[in-house]
């Protein structure tokens, strides 16, 4: 929903100054840092040492450049992906990947690199969401084969309940708030906006030309420069030809869905729904599913 939220803000209030933050690229930087440690026998490589150029949409970003201490990591990554065809990282005790909601063996992102030549920069469970449905999400067995986890609705409900309970304890004073580093860039972004230094990090903004081959105004994710009272997108270049069809389809669907919601146009919403790469059923079945979802969420 990140892209849709940012797009809606600018659609309703064009003068707004808003941006969307996401840590998926950070996770890919950490993954590449672990690769650097293995390949170059380094210790404790920080993700900030991995310099990247992300292009795409939220949760479906691609790196067209990645380096460590001025060394191009693409050739290194190509060899790394071949070496770790069975996955990378520690294997969990429970090998049922359907129950390992936030763990993966990075197989999806490495498969996408071998096929398209660019680094997919998000967690495997998110990357799978934006690819054609039969690739990685055909059924639970397919998920197990690709060794990533699915987040269940039951877990989300329990997690929300626990977080609301924690909030209540903090408000009442029953629990003391503890300051710690979350690994996010939010504080650094605010400091930069206040004029306390500059920062370059990846965020979601309307396309002003930072990705020339996606529509102007579409919300895209690239690096941006934060400085006193300003956030300026960094020119990232075109989406590569190999991944352009995948990303352009998602971007178009997101724009359709925003327009459908704001104009209350169910026909346009259905067109966006059937355009989604995960919708692989017959049109008649898609219509039944769509109508059922609309009816069951009507109260909201």
What is each model feature region?
Residues 37-300:
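Long, compositionally biased stretches enriched for glycine and/or charged residues
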Residues 1-66:
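Internal, well-ordered domain-core segments that constitute the primary functional module
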């Amino acid at each position: 929903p990140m892209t849709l939220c940012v797009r809606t803000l600018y659609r309703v209030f064009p003068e707004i100054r808003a941006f969307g933050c996401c840590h998926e690229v950070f996770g890919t930087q950490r993954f590449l840092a672990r690769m650097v440690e293995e390949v170059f026998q380094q210790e404790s490589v920080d993700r900030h040492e991995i310099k990247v150029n992300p292009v795409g949409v939220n949760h479906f970003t691609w790196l067209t450049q990645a380096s460590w201490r001025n060394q191009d990591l693409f050739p290194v990554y190509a060899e790394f992906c071949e070496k770790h065809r069975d996955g990378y990282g520690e294997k969990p005790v429970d090998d049922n990947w359907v129950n390992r909601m936030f763990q993966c063996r990075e197989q999806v992102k490495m498969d996408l690199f071998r096929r398209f030549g660019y680094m997919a920069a998000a967690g495997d469970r998110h990357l799978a969401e934006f690819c054609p449905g039969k690739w990685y999400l055909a059924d639970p067995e397919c998920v197990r084969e690709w060794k990533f986890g699915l987040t269940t609705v039951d877990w989300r409900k329990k997690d929300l309940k626990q977080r609301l309970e924690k909030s209540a304890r903090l408000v009442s004073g029953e629990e003391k708030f503890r300051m710690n580093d979350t690994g996010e860039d939010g504080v650094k972004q605010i400091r930069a906006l206040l004029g306390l230094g500059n920062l370059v990090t990846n965020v979601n903004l309307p396309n002003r030309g930072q990705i020339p081959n996606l529509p102007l105004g579409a919300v895209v994710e690239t690096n941006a420069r934060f400085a006193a009272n300003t956030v300026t997108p960094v020119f990232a270049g075109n989406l590569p030809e190999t991944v352009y069809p995948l990303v352009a389809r998602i971007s178009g669907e997101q724009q359709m869905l925003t327009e459908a919601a704001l104009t209350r146009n169910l026909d346009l919403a259905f067109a966006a729904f059937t355009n989604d790469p995960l919708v692989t059923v017959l049109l008649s079945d898609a219509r039944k599913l769509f109508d059922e979802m609309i009816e069951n969420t009507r109260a909201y």
